[in-house]
Amino acid sequence: MYENELKRILNGDEKTLNKVTKSMNDREKEAYLSMIKYPFIVIRSTGSLGIADLVAIRSDLSMLIEVKARSSNKIMFSNESGRVQRAAEEMWKQCNRSGVMPIFAFRMKGYHGDAWRLFTLKVSSLSGKAKEVNKIIPKLSITKKMNFYMVWEDGMKLSDFIRIINSVGGKSPSERWGMITDNII
C-alpha cells in the first residue's frame, strides 16, 4: 500500500500528489508538486526482490528504495528473525557494487503533514549528484549488536529531499541543504 503511494509521489502522479499534500504546509506541498516536473520512472518489485521494494530512475539519480510503515516511531531491523537486517545488508552490498544510492523510506501511519522520512547508508562507489545527496541524508542508526534501526524523527523529510534533488540554479545539493536547514532552524 505505502510502496504504491511513494511510487506515485516519485512518479509525479498529480492525483496522488494532490491527495497526500492536503494536510501539508505550503513549503512541503510545493516540494511534492515539483515531482510533476521532475518525475522518476519507478518500478515496484512484486514480492520484493529481496533487495528493495522500489527502483527509481531518472537522468540524474538512481535509487533502490526499501519502504517501511509503522504507527510507532522506531523500526528495529533485527525484528522479524533478522530478515530485514539481512535484506538491508544485501541492499548496501549491491548498491556499493553498482554505484546506486540506497534509500530507506519510513512512513509514519496517521501523521498529518509530510509523513515520510528518509535514511540511507554510506556508499563509497557513488558519483555525481548521488554522492552529494548521500552525504546529507541521515544514515541508519546502529545498535551495539550491529543491527540497523530507524527513529522517524531522525530522518530527512521527503519534502526536503525532493526540494534538494529538484532544485535549479546550479547550487550543489549540500549548498541547498544548508539553505533548507537555515530556514528550519
Regions found by a protein language model. Give the residues of each.
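Acidic-basic catalytic patches of nuclease active cores, encompassing PD-(D/E)XK
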Residues: 1-46
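Short amphipathic alpha-helical segments and helix-helix/interface helices
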Residues: 7, 88-95
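Phosphate- and other anionic-substrate recognition elements at nucleic-acid/protein interfaces
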Residues: 25, 74-76, 142
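Active-site beta-strand-loop-beta-strand hairpin of nuclease catalytic cores
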Residues: 47-68
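Short beta-strand-loop-alpha-helix junction that forms the active-site gateway
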Residues: 67-81
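Substrate-gripping "pore-loop 1 plus following alpha2 helix"
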Residues: 79-90
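Nucleic-acid nuclease catalytic cores
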Residues: 92-126
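Intrinsically disordered, low-complexity terminal regions enriched in charged/polar residues
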Residues: 114-185
